[in-house]
Amino acid sequence: MSSSSATSGVVGDRGVPCKCVCGLSVTVFTSKSQDNSGRPFFRCISKRDAKTWTNNRNGHLFKWVEEAVFEEVEDALPRLAVIANEINKAKSEALELKAMIQEILEEALINKMQIRRNWCGLKLGFVWLFVITIVIVYVLFGQDNEKKLVAGY
């Protein structure tokens, strides 16, 4: 096996290949050459027989596994950076929402205390109204039987 790492016939294919340009699937083989003994590589299944392998790949896929994995990692790093950025944005939004919730809870507590104060004031107002009504009724109708309300005098 040659130590070349070109992906013959697959222009722009990065990462772990799943199909050859001929349309057949790709499988992993292990190199038995002296230069790359035991080194795994991807190869088109049409080239199963090692005797048909030549330096001229006849347009079929050949790629070393570690190069494919390296390309996958290289391609994943920007996506990981984007995901990390999104996580940081989500964390800051969560902190903002927690602060907003805290403000709303504080406002609710203040409003609850104001409602209690107003309710007590309303009760006190009704008590005074009741007392004044009783006093007026007593003054008008509760004094001596001799004094009666006479119209005009």
UniProtKB/Swiss-Prot annotation:
In this chain, the GRF-type zinc fingers fall at 20-68
The transit peptide segment here is 1-43
Read off the InterPro entries from this record: Znf_GRF
Q: Where does Zn(2+) bind?
A: C20, C22, C44, H60
Membrane topology is: Single-pass membrane protein
Q: Name one GO molecular function term.
A: zinc ion binding
Sorted UniProt keywords: Chloroplast, Membrane, Metal-binding, Plastid, Transit peptide, Transmembrane, Transmembrane helix, Zinc, Zinc-finger
Q: Where are the transmembrane segments?
A: 121-141
Tell me, in one coarse class, where this protein mainly resides.
Answer: plastid
Q: Which GO terms describe its cellular component?
A: chloroplast membrane
Localization = Plastid, Chloroplast membrane
Name assigned to this protein: Uncharacterized protein At1g43920, Chloroplastic
